[in-house]
Curated annotation (Swiss-Prot):
The lineage of its organism: Bacteria, Pseudomonadati, Pseudomonadota, Gammaproteobacteria, Enterobacterales. Keywords: Plasmid. It comes from the Bacteria. This is Uncharacterized 10.0 kDa protein.
Amino acid sequence: MKRLLLQNVCDLSNNMNGLRFPCFVKSGNAEVSALHHYVPDLHRRMLLATLWNTYICINEALALTLSDFSLVPPHPYRQLFTLTTFQ
């Protein structure tokens, strides 16, 4: 889920086998933890966690429903259907 269309792209070739990622990927979880500390409710925390972990756009995240998530251990994940899935 790399977003290469951003203009501000950092070169992480020494760390990521020549792949190019946006600069915000280099930032650690300290910023995200600080955001989670100030978010008042669980609904918004889940939205921020989904945006951070999947790198999807806000419109895609707001369109997700509970059935799009699998919350069973050991690895919770998000299942997003694309146009190729429906064909």
